[in-house]
Amino acid sequence: MILGSTGSIGTQAIDLVLRNPDRFRVTGLSAAGGRVGLLAEQAHRLRVSTVAVAREDVVPVLREALTAQYGPGEPLPEILAGADAATQLAASDCHTVLNGITGSIGLAPTLAALEAGRTLALANKESLIVGGPLVKALAKPGQIIPVDSEHAALFQALAAGTRADVRKLVVTASGGPFRGRTKAELANVSPEHALAHPTWAMGPVITINSATLVNKGLEVIEAHLLYDIPFERIEVVVHPQSYVHSMVEFTDGSTLAQATPPDMRGPIAIGLGWPERVPDAAPAFDWTKASSWEFFPLDNDAFPSVGLARHVGQLAGTAPAVFNAANEECVDAFLNGTLPFNGIMETVTRVVEEHGTPRTGTSLTVADVLEAETWARARARELTVQTATAEARA
């Protein structure tokens, strides 16, 4: 099953599957519903039995698009529609669910896949971050295979030792399009500038999260949850070339780094094929050519998101859900031109502070997470409106 099939992760996963028909067979696809033509084309090429869309209003258009793709007499796939369509699909019969949905709406499908006993290839980091204790309570050892390039790298490097052998995890960051700029220089950057990522081709929300380094903050929380390494032993370094995807430093002083040219098909292949490797899943280095690999410390003043993420990760409970939801609203406001770039983290910080002590412990429920998210989104919207009004008067 591929959830989020028309997005960046989904389309690259399908490319990998089509190049390896002897290894993979896809039985279902899900998408939000904004690209029904592409969804219908994917369904036909993969011969899936079920497609799911979040938007019920696009079902007639989707059915028409499917009819145009399939020949006379060919049975059309079953269509699931509605807010819980992807969750239904995630729980249906298959071996592996690739969750490539963007945002915390991926939580319910993640929980459904785990509860149904599926192997979860997890690209939707938000579901683990906002539902940490809930996800970990359901997941059996080895059931979650991370698809983020950084966590796929850690996943492979950690196999070289035991948890007791690990001194620290080193998560690398490209630094985004604004690497080297000061906080003052970031004040007036535009969405167009922020969307021009120097290394990776991603969707708009993830690209902005990479520009603010919120994405890296989320990855620090994710690394803590996946590998049970304390936050003080998870380090972030800037690596502009994005060749080294993460590193593990062991207690004997050795460091294992996983390195490939930046191409998400590599981590996707790990998620779908593990414990086997998929030959030629992504390009390899030409080691006969000279290249420079640079590493720099993180500028926490210009990019306070990683420090804030550590803070909410340590608070745990509903705090990560508040952080993520507020950020999603602020990113939307920035893309719409109603919030300045630096205003994203300023607003998220204020929402986290106003949230106060999060609800934590074994009593945490999905309802608690959703309630915290709803409050955070509403409060973030209020604050972005106040910011826009103040700037208009200035």
UniProtKB/Swiss-Prot annotation:
What pathway annotation does it carry?
Answer: Isoprenoid biosynthesis; isopentenyl diphosphate biosynthesis via DXP pathway; isopentenyl diphosphate from 1-deoxy-D-xylulose 5-phosphate: step 1/6
Name the coenzymes or cofactors required. Mg(2+); Mn(2+)
Q: Which molecular function GO terms apply here?
A: 1-deoxy-D-xylulose-5-phosphate reductoisomerase activity; manganese ion binding; NADPH binding
A Gene Ontology biological process noted in the UniProt record is:
isopentenyl diphosphate biosynthetic process, methylerythritol 4-phosphate pathway involved in terpenoid biosynthetic process
What PANTHER family does the annotation carry?
1-DEOXY-D-XYLULOSE 5-PHOSPHATE REDUCTOISOMERASE, 1-DEOXY-D-XYLULOSE 5-PHOSPHATE REDUCTOISOMERASE, CHLOROPLASTIC
Function, as annotated: Catalyzes the NADPH-dependent rearrangement and reduction of 1-deoxy-D-xylulose-5-phosphate (DXP) to 2-C-methyl-D-erythritol 4-phosphate (MEP).
Protein name as it appears in the record: 1-deoxy-D-xylulose 5-phosphate reductoisomerase
Species per Swiss-Prot/TrEMBL record: Streptomyces avermitilis (strain ATCC 31267 / DSM 46492 / JCM 5070 / NBRC 14893 / NCIMB 12804 / NRRL 8165 / MA-4680)
Question: What gene is this protein translated from?
Answer: dxr
